[in-house]
């Protein structure tokens, strides 16, 4: 199956708050094939289904906070199954959770078992701290994927954060090939103070062409565009990023756009 291009909706959260349906229509018009949710903005499961059907967008999955999975896993599983979403993704771990990896790993196994039983797939989405912090003598990210079986946890690799952490995203794609359905495609510049500023695809320092090539070669189902913060209008940002994606595809990038 050819790799498709989706959008992590966190990118356009300001617009979703004001006009959820209109924003999803715009995302579809721009050429994104699927969306990864980060909240549903008070919409019912029926309302989400309706706008997905209208726009033809695929529900790729949902970034679902770790604590929400602890408290309301069954509810989240039911919602995702109903809208046709396949992936439940742990998006982020708060600072206070980053010193209790054995417990987190056991929780991921539990979540993964329940997802699997319902025909869904649990993924983990990294930032930079999973590469800079260690557990059992290796980067946390590697420890998680080593200690939670592949059958219970798949990889959503945020290649931009891997690069920002000083690791090699191409090596990580190669390492987790076959376990890597989702790849976040993101660009950034490192500011003078060393902090990251996310920018539109092609405007930053990340090797996004090589990452796209590697993700496609590794059999990723989705390359998911994400921009954590947009300096201008977020809808303009996702338009600019899609223009870069189309140019990439026109130059031979093997993508369905």
PLM segments and residue spans:
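Active-site-adjacent beta->alpha loops and helix N-cap segments on the catalytic face
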Residues: 40-51, 99-101, 107
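Short acidic, glycine/proline-enriched helix-loop-strand junctions
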Residues: 44-63, 111, 118-120, 241-243
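Domain-start "cap" segments at the beginnings of catalytic or binding domains
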Residues: 36-39, 44-45, 58, 67, ...
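Active-site beta-loop-alpha junctions enriched in small/polar residues
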Residues: 8-12, 38-40, 64-67, 92-95, ...
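Short glycine-/small-residue-rich flexible loop motifs, especially phosphate/cofactor-binding loops
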Residues: 24, 49, 77, 112, ...
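Active-site acidic/histidine proton-transfer and metal-coordination neighborhood
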Residues: 34, 66-154, 162-164, 235
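Conserved beta-strand positions in the central sheet of alpha/beta enzyme cores
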Residues: 6, 36, 61, 89, ...
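Histidine-acidic metal/acid-base catalytic patches
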Residues: 1-29, 53, 81-84, 135-137, ...
């Amino acid at each position: 199956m050819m790799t498709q291009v989706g959008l992590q909706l966190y990118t356009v959260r300001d617009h979703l708050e004001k006009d959820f349906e209109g924003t999803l229509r715009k995302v579809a018009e721009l050429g994104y094939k699927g969306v990864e949710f980060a909240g549903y903005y008070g919409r019912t499961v029926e309302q989400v289904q309706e706008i997905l059907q209208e726009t033809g967008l695929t529900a790729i999955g949902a970034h679902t906070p770790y604590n929400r999975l602890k408290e309301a896993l069954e509810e989240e599983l039911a919602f995702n199954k109903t809208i046709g979403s396949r992936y439940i993704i742990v998006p982020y771990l708060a600072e206070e959770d980053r010193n209790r990896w054995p417990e987190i790993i056991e929780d991921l196994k539990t979540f993964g078992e329940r997802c699997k039983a319902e025909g869904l797939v649990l993924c983990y989405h990294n930032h930079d701290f999973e590469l800079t912090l260690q557990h059992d003598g290796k980067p946390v990210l590697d420890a998680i994927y080593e200690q939670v079986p592949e059958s219970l946890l798949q990889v959503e690799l945020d290649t931009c954060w891997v690069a920002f952490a000083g690791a090699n995203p191409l090596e990580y794609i190669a390492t987790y090939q076959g376990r890597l359905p989702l790849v976040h495609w993101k660009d950034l510049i490192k500011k003078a103070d060393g902090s990251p500023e996310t920018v539109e695809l092609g405007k930053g320092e990340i090797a996004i062409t090589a990452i796209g090539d590697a993700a496609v070669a590794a059999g990723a189902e989705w390359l998911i565009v994400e921009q954590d913060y947009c300096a201008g209008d977020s809808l303009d940002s996702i338009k600019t990023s899609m223009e870069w994606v189309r140019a990439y595809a026109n130059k031979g990038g093997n993508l369905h756009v």
